[in-house]
Amino acid sequence: MATAKRAQGSQSHVAIAFEADFGTTPSTGGVITPIISSSVKASQNLNDSTVIRGDRNPAAPFRGNIDTSGSLTVPVGVIDIGYWLKAAFGQPTSNTTGQAPNKKSEHVFKIGNTMPSLTIEQGYPDVNVFQQFAGVRVSKLGFKFGGDSELTASVDVMGCKETLAATTFDAAAKAVNFLPFQNLNATIKEGGVTVANILSCDINFDFGLDGDSYAIGGKGFRTYIDPGIVSISGTIKAFFQNKDLLNKAVNGTESSLELQLAQDDWTLTFKLPELVYERQSPGIDGPRGVNIELPFKAYYRADAGRSASIITLVNNQEQY
C-alpha cells in the first residue's frame, strides 16, 4: 500500500494581513513573513458528562468552547520585525527622507489606545491545507538580547476563529526580504550612559488581552478580544563590579534602558525611559566571575515621549 505524503515544514509558510474589520479575513494585503516556528492552533475540550442513567456506562462527552491561541518564534529582521511591532503597538509614526538608493524611513512605535487585529495563515501548500486564524491580536511579545544565539522574538497570540481552507486567502501575498539584525551589533545604555558590562537583557511586553468573550451564538468561538493595560518587564544580567546597579535597586532609584541593534545603515532601538529595578542581591556560585541579575519593570509617569516604551525602526520601507 502506498504511503501518503505528509506536509513538510520547509515548504510551509506563515502569511499575515491586517484586518479592516475585526475578525474579517482580507483578500489582499497579505505578507509572507519569515519564522523559526509557529504553533498557532484552535483547541476544543471534550468535557465529561455527569449524567446518571442507571448503570455504570459513561454518557457521551460534550464539546466546550474553542480556544484559538499559540506562539510564534520569529527572527528579528530589518523589514519583517516591523509587521510584528505594528501588530503589537499599532500603526507607527513614519517619516521618510532621501531618495533611492539612499532613502531612509523611520518608524516609531509607542503604546496607544487601540490595537490592530490580523489574520494569520499557517499554510501547507504541498497538501493544500491552509489554517486561517481571524480576529488575532498579540498577547505577549518578548526579546532576548546578548550571547551568540540567533536573535529572535517570541510572539504569543490570541484569536477568535479558525477556518480550514483549500487555498490561501491572498494568492498575491509577497514574501518579505529578509536581512537579520544580530546580537553582535548591539549596544546598550543604562541610565543614559553607554555601558559594556551588561551580558544580557530580556524585555517582555504583556498586552493584557481579555479573551473571556464567548458570546451565545458564537458557535464556541470568541467574538471579540479586548486589549488591556500593557505591562513591561525584563531582566538585565551584568558584571558585579561595584554597588552602582545594586544601589539603584535597593533605593528604588528610577533609571532607563536603551538598546540599539545595527545592520548596515539600518537600526532598531528599544527605549524604556522610566523603570525601576527589583532588589536582588548577587551570590557566589563558584570560583568564576560574579554577576548580578536585576529584574525590572518599566512604566510611564512623566517622560516627554509619553510612552512606557518607544521602539524606533529605521529601514528602507516607507509604510507598514
Predicted regions located by residue number:
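Signature of extracytoplasmic/envelope-associated structural regions
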Residues: M1-Y320
